[in-house]
Amino acid sequence: MGKAKSPRRVADNEALAVGTTIRGSAQKLNLVAELIRGKKAEEALNILAFSKKAMARDASKVLASAIANAENNHDLDVDALVVAEASVGKSITMKRFHTRGRGKSTRILKPFSKLRIVVREVEEA
């Protein structure tokens, strides 16, 4: 006896990948996510590979994972994949302190973000 299998969170022609602790603010990660929303998966990988943004490397890893999930787990055609969804949210925030003059200290906040990418198989027209 175990838990009942939970239903899929995405449709049958979709695959999902989530990056939960990407170092940097959600606002900066969203700039990278905007570059790939609605693009073909292969084109999106090329855009991220040549982007100057530091978070593009992490977003590229999540996108590659979504493509691999589509191919290996859901038997979808890799050439027909499109980035259907690229949503960004806040994750944890590491709190550090910085010592200042006269025995004082200030807070340093190091934010992390999460990225959820859904790729969908579309019919070639």
Swiss-Prot record:
SUPFAM superfamilies for the chain: Ribosomal protein L22
InterPro entries to which the protein is assigned, alphabetical: Ribosomal_uL22, Ribosomal_uL22_bac/chlpt-type, Ribosomal_uL22_bac/org-type, Ribosomal_uL22_sf
One GO biological process term is:
translation
Which GO MF term does the entry hold, naming one? rRNA binding
Q: Identify the GO cellular component terms for this protein.
A: cytosolic large ribosomal subunit
Note the Pfam families from the entry. Ribosomal_L22
Recite the UniProt keywords alphabetically. Answer: Ribonucleoprotein, Ribosomal protein, RNA-binding, rRNA-binding
Family to which this protein belongs: Belongs to the universal ribosomal protein uL22 family.
Job description of the protein: This protein binds specifically to 23S rRNA; its binding is stimulated by other ribosomal proteins, e.g. L4, L17, and L20. It is important during the early stages of 50S assembly. It makes multiple contacts with different domains of the 23S rRNA in the assembled 50S subunit and ribosome. The globular domain of the protein is located near the polypeptide exit tunnel on the outside of the subunit, while an extended beta-hairpin is found that lines the wall of the exit tunnel in the center of the 70S ribosome.
Q: How does it assemble?
A: Part of the 50S ribosomal subunit.
Q: Which PANTHER family match?
A: CHLOROPLAST 50S RIBOSOMAL PROTEIN L22-RELATED, LARGE RIBOSOMAL SUBUNIT PROTEIN UL22M
Annotated protein name in UniProt: Large ribosomal subunit protein uL22
